[in-house]
Amino acid sequence: MKDILIVIPARMSSSRLPGKPLINIAGLPMIHHVWNRALQVTSSDNIVVATEDNEIIDYCITNDINCILTDKAASEVDRVKLVSDKIAAKIYICACGDEPLINVEDIKTIIAKSDSSKNQFIIGRKSIDENEFNDPSKAKIVFDEQNRVLYASRAGIPVDYKGQFQKAHKAIWIHSYTKNVLDSYFSQGLCSAESLDGLSIHRFLQIGIPVYCIDLIGDSWAVDEPKDIKIVEDRLRNLH
């Protein structure tokens, strides 16, 4: 059994940017950038690309990237669960395949805070300004003094008693969980809040799995539509 397994979920179907895992960004397909970032955290034996698409599998095999073909999955968490059925690990880390700038130190931080003896779900967080607060593409989280998440929403939360923004945090989608947690999540099926805004965190909260959030650098940039490609390429260029 592996101590950790970094799973990179990827799929070709995307309403805003079809085929995005294999889109060329600064000379490499996006999925290859994420793989290279993960390699700065651990050895290749502890990393796998998980997908339902043969095109991605073919690319990975040709380029010596570990990969696994899964059934179709409703979310990245569901896909990690499918991987956990085939590859045993104490801790599974989800590093989203559409983030070619995923921060290596953030992955290391999530791993360091993970505990295979506890049934918990760990995600990252970052403070945000009012623009991101009002952006429904950003998932906002509210947490207590023990960093346990109380609620999440695409709406702007929390607000003060006048309904105004004061301070807030968004979720950073690097996750960690055990096999037991993934099995519990998968066995419950979609909950009502999750079906409303597409945030898998709701299901963990509904079934009583503790969700903890930790501060991350959070300077990645997800590629969701064509305009994001240039942003990422510019950032990559500035790194060299």
Explain the meaning of each model-derived region.
Residues 2-50:
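N-terminal glycine-rich phosphate-binding loop and ensuing alpha1 helix
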Residues 22, 141-142, 213:
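A structural signal for short hydrophobic beta-strand segments in well-ordered beta-sheet cores
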Residues 6, 47-49, 92, 149, ...:
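Hydrophobic/aromatic residues located in beta-strands of well-ordered beta-sheets
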